[in-house]
Structures are given as structure tokens and as C-alpha cells.
Amino acid sequence: MNKIFGLLFTLCLLLVWPTPGNGQSPDESRLLVAIHYEALCPDSMSFIRRRLYDALQDNDWWSVTDLKLYPFGKAGFYNNTSTGESQVFCQHGVDECELNALHACIIETLDIRKAFNLIYCMLRSYSNELGPCSRSMGVDVSKARECKASRTTAEILAPYGKETLKLGISFVPTIVFENDFDPYDQRSIRNNFERHFCRQYLKKFNIKLPTCSAIL
């Protein structure tokens, strides 16, 4: 009897225990979506503000999306021979490197939905103002500021650069579903993000999301 009880107890634990590493229960089916972008890139700003944000909000897709943001884009690292330190260069100059690093610190120190909403607000203009956006949203960004002030830009951007440079991207923003990078379909994904999201979700989970019937 004790053995039977033990087996039943173990089975129950396996059924209800969260998936390791993500805190989600097994029935929470989320599609992994990675956005590789730049803080001063007009196309990045347009995609995030006009397509990605609206898609997640209007379709109520936050609960089915595992969103990853990589503020690096077509940047790179080099060794400063005079100091011996690793440094970073960015497509739109030094200011973009600093803003990319600030975005990275926001992503590191806030939960992803709060971080995304804050970045969405900042991308209204090229100044990427953190103060007005954080105050209007009532978000504490002290840890993000500390992150930015306590480390070099290259150190902050290193993990984001590592993932982005693996892809060898030629355009920003670049969107990747489930770590499966398709360089030839990027324009279509950018212009028809909702349709591609629906297709990818159906492909992975064999589930057509409620709003996808009108999209596919």
C-alpha cells in the first residue's frame, strides 16, 4: 500500500511541477520569438511600435509568447590596442551603443513585459528618454541605471552580441521564431508578423489561436 501511495504521489508531482528553468506549467504553450534590433534604427523603431506591440496587445498574445529582445543589431566588437580592452561599435554610432546598452540593462532588470512596454515608450523618439517614460509608467528603473553605470558598454552587450553575431544578420530588425533563423523570409515576417506568428504557433503546437482564424 505504501509503495502504491508513493508512486501516486510521485506521479502527481510530475503532473503539476513547473517546467525546469522557466517557471511555466506544461500546459502553458509559448512560442519563442526573438527580436534583434537597434535603438536608433528607424526600421527597428517602426516594427516594434507599429507591428510587434500591436500584435501582442490586440491579439492578447502575451500569454502565448516567450519574447526575447536583443538590442545589438549590426554592431560588433574590437580590441582597443591602446587600452587592451574590448570595445563595441554600432551601425548608428556611439550614441546607439550607449542606448543599446541601456535597453539591455532594462531587459536584465525588469520582467520582459514591463521592459518591452518601457522600451516601446522610449522608441517614440531618437532620444530614447528613459526618465519621462519610466515616470509616466510608474516603473522603478534604479537597477537599470545602476547596471548601466557599473559596467562597460561592451560588457553589457556581450551576451546580446554573442547571440546576434551567430546569425550573421544583414538587416535590422531580424525576427527569429523558435531559434530557426530564416534569412530569406525576413521582409515578409516584418510586414506580416501576425500571419507568421499564427503559422509558427500552429506548426509547433497544432493549435490555431482564436484571432488567427481571421489572419490565416
Swiss-Prot record:
Which PANTHER family does its entry note? GAMMA-INTERFERON INDUCIBLE LYSOSOMAL THIOL REDUCTASE GILT, GILT-LIKE PROTEIN 2-RELATED
**Entry similarity comment:** Belongs to the GILT family.
Q: Where in the cell is it found?
A: Secreted
List the gene name. GILT3
- Superkingdom as given in the UniProt entry: Eukaryota
The keyword Secreted is assigned to this record: yes
Name it.
Answer: GILT-like protein 3
In terms of InterPro entries, this protein maps to: Interferon-induced_GILT
The region annotated as signal peptide is: 1-23
Principal subcellular localisation of the protein: secreted
From what organism does this protein derive?
Drosophila melanogaster
Explain the purpose of this protein.
Involved in the immune response to bacterial infection.
Q: Which GO terms describe its molecular function?
A: oxidoreductase activity; oxidoreductase activity, acting on a sulfur group of donors; oxidoreductase activity, acting on a sulfur group of donors, disulfide as acceptor
GO cellular component, alphabetical, reads:
extracellular region
Sorted keywords for this record are:
Glycoprotein, Secreted, Signal
Summarize induction of expression: Up-regulated following injection with the Gram-negative bacterium E.coli. Up-regulation increases between 1 and 12 hours after the injection, then decreases between 12 and 48 hours, and then increases again at 72 hours.
Carbohydrate attachment sites? 79
